[in-house]
Regions:
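Domain-level recognition of soluble alpha/beta enzyme cores
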Residues: 21-135, 391
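Short, solvent-exposed beta-strand-terminating loops
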Residues: 75-93, 151-153, 187, 336-355
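Primarily recognizes the serine-hydrolase "nucleophile elbow" in alpha/beta-hydrolase
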Residues: 228-302
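Glycine-rich His-Gly loop
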Residues: 73, 138-142, 267, 313
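Short substrate-entry loop that stabilizes the transition state in hydrolases
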Residues: 120-133, 138-153, 164, 172, ...
Length: 421
């Protein structure tokens, strides 16, 4: 079982005082990375906040009912190995199948394009026990994986773990003794009692709603379970990590502010965030990045009474989805929705920074808005919203205008209709 959605656990957010948030870095760093011409990035943006970033993988139980996620957290500054953005070759094969391309040649092409890309976080770095940190659970989209939105979220554990019943998952591990980042002992190593099982991508024929609705319920359960694992760790309970990683989970005891837990998701993960907000009262609010509304029932949407912030791209939402989003927002006076000009559905993912021109022509992964600018707008708007909802003692309210839909790079909201005389 493999993470299917990010669980952004631990610890706060972006830059100005929050631990992480992969953002653009200095102008010199940005220019240095534009070595492929036409402003194309060949690696992910580096963090620019006050905290260095560490990460580790956690598998609490190795069955379908277990939790498998990546945890990003504030760490002490140190040199160390950076995990690969795409951890195993099987992921390239899964991406190829999801994109309806040749598993053989297109996977090799993806490997050549992205094989050297690293996540800008230090593997198994020592946790920075400096203050209690809010917790974010992040859930990614279909055909994605735990690193797919590293640059767009704060800290997260990429949680979701597709099972045989997840028709959209690319190959995933159902059990393993090796973590995905830096090389580690394989399940076939002496003394290992577990075996890997990769789940091939399954296409959905015909009407999608029934399958996707079941699937989003499973993803919600996984996010809730991951949050429970974090709560257990925070309370000092022993959590047996099946993976051999070397990170001391006991260091996390008492440092997570679970009274300030929220859930964030992109696309299908956005639908997950909406349903999770209705299901688990521990989540105080949700942020939805271009959420895919199809898997959700109207009944589920009507149960969401807490604040929700939807950040949409310009081209993805249908008219029906827009109407459902408006009804969803009307259920809480603190809920908001904004649309970023020139953005596309993948603008909220790492692919927008890494995609070469030929791939973008075919798959429209980059919008007309500069990728770094789009990331900054998303990050700043999220931080301003979260400061409101989580009572953060920061200065993120300087971006409140973005939450209200005001800014040159936001699509103006239509004026409310005026009643007749």
């Amino acid at each position: 079982m493999e993470p299917v959605g990010p669980v952004l656990p631990l610890f706060s957010l972006e830059n100005q005082g929050f631990p992480v948030f992969f953002s653009q870095g200095t102008e010199a760093e940005v220019l240095q990375r534009r070595s492929m011409g036409n402003g194309q990035f060949i690696q992910l943006p580096v963090p620019k906040g006050p905290h260095s970033v560490g990460c580790t993988d956690i598998m609490a139980g190795h069955t379908k009912e277990g939790s498998f996620f990546r945890l990003y957290y504030p760490c002490d500054p140190e040199e160390g190995e950076k995990p690969p953005w795409i951890p195993r070759y099987e992921y390239y094969q899964g991406l190829a199948e999801y994109l309806k391309r040749s598993r053989r040649w297109f996977a090799s092409l993806l490997n050549m394009a992205f094989g050297d890309c690293k996540v800008p976080a230090t593997w198994n770095a020592r946790f920075k026990a400096n203050e209690t940190y809010p917790v974010i659970v992040f859930s990614h989209g279909l055909g994605a994986f735990r690193d797919e939105s590293a640059s767009t979220t704060y800290y997260f554990e990429s949680l979701p773990k597709p099972t045989e019943h997840d028709p959209t998952s690319k190959p995933q591990k159902t059990s393993s003794t090796s973590s995905s980042p830096p090389p580690s002992p394989s399940p076939s190593s002496p003394g290992s009692s577990l075996q890997e099982k990769w789940l091939p991508y399954r296409k959905v024929e015909g009407e999608e709603f029934e399958m996707r609705n079941r699937q989003v319920g499973q993803r919600v359960d996984e996010c809730v379970h991951a949050l429970q694992v974090l709560e257990d760790l925070n309370n000092g309970h022993n959590v047996d990590n099946v993976l051999e990683g070397g990170f001391d989970l006991s260091m996390l005891k008492g440092w997570m502010d679970l009274h300030r837990a929220t859930i964030v998701g992109h696309s299908f993960g956005g639908a997950t965030a909406i349903q999770a907000l209705a299901k688990d009262t521990r989540f105080r609010c949700a942020v939805v990045l271009d959420g895919w509304m199809l898997p959700l029932t109207d009944e589920t949407c009507s149960q969401v009474q807490k604040p929700i912030f939807l950040i949409n791209s310009e081209k993805f939402q249908t008219q029906d989805s827009k109407e459902r989003i408006e009804r969803l927002c009307s259920q809480n006076s603190q809920s908001r929705v904004i649309t970023i000009k020139g953005s596309v559905h993948q603008s909220h993912t790492d692919f927008t920074f890494l995609t070469l021109k030929p791939l973008n022509v075919v798959f429209e992964i980059k919008g007309t808005i500069d990728s770094m600018l789009g990331l900054d707008i998303t990050n700043h708007a999220m931080l301003a919203f979260l400061q409101r909802q989580l009572d953060l003692q920061k200065d993120f309210n300087k971006w409140d205008d973005l939450v209200e839909g005001l800014g040159e790079h936001l699509v103006p909201r239509p004026a409310p209709s005026q009643a007749g005389p």
